[in-house]
Amino acid sequence: MQFGELVKALAAVESTTQRSVMVKLLASLFKKALPEEIDKVIYLILGDLRPPWEGLELGVGEKLCLRALAKATGTSQAELESMYKKTGDIGEAARRALASSKRPGLLAFGSQKPLEVSEVYDALIKVARATGEGAQDMKIALLSSLFARSSPEEGKYIARFVVGKLRLGVADMTIIEALADAYGVRKEDLERAYHVYPDLGHLAKLVASGKPLDEVKVTPGVPVLPMLAQRLSSSSEILAKLGGAAICEYKYDGERAQIHISQSGVRIFSRRLEDITHAYPDVVKAVREAVSAREAILEGEIVAVDPDTGEMLPFQELMHRKRKHEVAAAMEMYPTVLYLFDIVYVDGEDLTNEPLIYRRVKLSEIVHESDKVQIAKWQMFDDPDTVDVFFHEAVSVGTEGLICKSPTSEYEMGARGWNWIKYKRDYKSEMIDTVDLVVVGAFYGRGKRAGLYGAFLLAAYDPSSDMFYTVCKVGSGFTDADLKKMYEILQPLKIPHRHPRVSSKMEADVWFVPQVVIEVIGAEITLSPLHTCCLGAVRPGVGLAVRFPRFTGRYRTDKGPEQATTVAEMLELYKRQKKVAQPE
């Protein structure tokens, strides 16, 4: 496939505001791709070179990209920086530079063989793998060569890709729907395979080659999509929902981790499927000593503890582990305990279809507890009063509450069902729980906030439609430093119109690709004609909103947009409020 054909499709996707049109455009593109290149097409659309757990990054910043452009076009770096500053889009700066270049050495587009998708992808792989002495010069040489062969429009998307600002916001579920349409496979079969092996490039190659998806198996070293929980606010409701009995375990305030043990060693993956092994060398060592299985996939929570008292510390303290040069110091200041709560696979046996009570037995058989690795504290209950006693015990030792689970439940990869239910402590006069919402738009600040965004339009996610529905406009709770940080992280995601996966009645001053997730609290969930979340579910023409929303200060960098609070959860929160709200 010619790269220009991919670029033409990307431009069409970028210009649409309808998700259904986006799916059709992608399906049409996939039909034209050869089986041996479909994976590369998909990786480029998603803005990645490989799946997230491989951690392959280009290592190209904006300045290096502009240096490569300067070399390819003969345009000065100062002029390119000026173009970039004026447009706010490095892709547009690249397009203009390539369109206006009169450098004799620049190969005229059209007088040569057009770029192929595979050529572009392979060149970018070489850029990513250039390391060591002279790596920067090698990256510049490879990129400038690529720009020199690009049309202005092709260069626009190459520049955006290499600095991680593609701005398409195409989600994995959108790709799955388009693949199902293009190759005539059942969307449900693709989803199941994706939950087990969440590498869309790999899966696309399988379906394009006519290979059966049922051959996709749970594999140590490849993270599965984690099972997720719903939420309720009373023990009696929880037990009723779970059939009268529940395994209740402490809900630790840490980083959820998927631990993979194989012949190649121990690897740790985040809930976003990223390899975070480098941040937890102490956990790797502790797992090697505590787990007797040759191969296993375990689920747990990594919790920071006070080195002097052993008390559990808030999740935020683990952020010190994210800076590679600070890991050694962070291990001393913020040691961790791994609390294991599930097992997905052990020594050739896929346990995802086994009941939880059986998985618990398997977990206890292979884990030899220590001060660094423990099995999450749990008990079986069938009485709400005893659940509440256990709940208060959990809160008193520093946890967030309980996770209550059906003893007979299978491990439902990627699902947020009613077999796992969060039971968290009440926030007194505020909402029952915080919500994690996606930033989809912003409003310009005034006065002290001039030059920044003063408020943000937030949305909940609907997995069934793969859409984001607005819930509130929030401007409270942000410090001056927060507002500056929000502006910086959102600028690369700025787009000229509402994203096709966003449903909104409100007109924001600025729209973004749905990507950034933040935690919000409020007075209550109320009915509102201004927002689209659960529109018509309670009353015709009226949606749900967070009343008096406030940013808690917590950036949910551990969550992707599709892991945010769902519209179904918002409806459940509304229904369980003691007082039914009236329309605003």
From Swiss-Prot:
GO terms for biological process: cell division; DNA biosynthetic process; DNA recombination; DNA repair; lagging strand elongation. Keywords: ATP-binding, Cell cycle, Cell division, DNA damage, DNA recombination, DNA repair, DNA replication, Ligase, Magnesium, Metal-binding, Nucleotide-binding. It comes from the Archaea. SUPFAM superfamilies: ATP-dependent DNA ligase DNA-binding domain, DNA ligase/mRNA capping enzyme, catalytic domain, Nucleic acid-binding proteins. Its EC number is 6.5.1.1. It holds the Pfam family DNA_ligase_A_N. It is an enzyme of class 6 (ligase). The keyword DNA repair applies. It catalyses: ATP + (deoxyribonucleotide)n-3'-hydroxyl + 5'-phospho-(deoxyribonucleotide)m = (deoxyribonucleotide)n+m + AMP + diphosphate. Its cofactor is Mg(2+). GO terms for molecular function: ATP binding; DNA binding; DNA ligase (ATP) activity; metal ion binding. ATP binds at residues 249, 256, 271, 301, 341, 416, 422. The active site is at residue 251. The keyword Nucleotide-binding applies. DNA ligase that seals nicks in double-stranded DNA during DNA replication, DNA recombination and DNA repair. PANTHER family: DNA LIGASE 1, DNA LIGASE 1/3 FAMILY MEMBER. Belongs to the ATP-dependent DNA ligase family. This is DNA ligase. It comes from Pyrobaculum arsenaticum (strain DSM 13514 / JCM 11321 / PZ6).
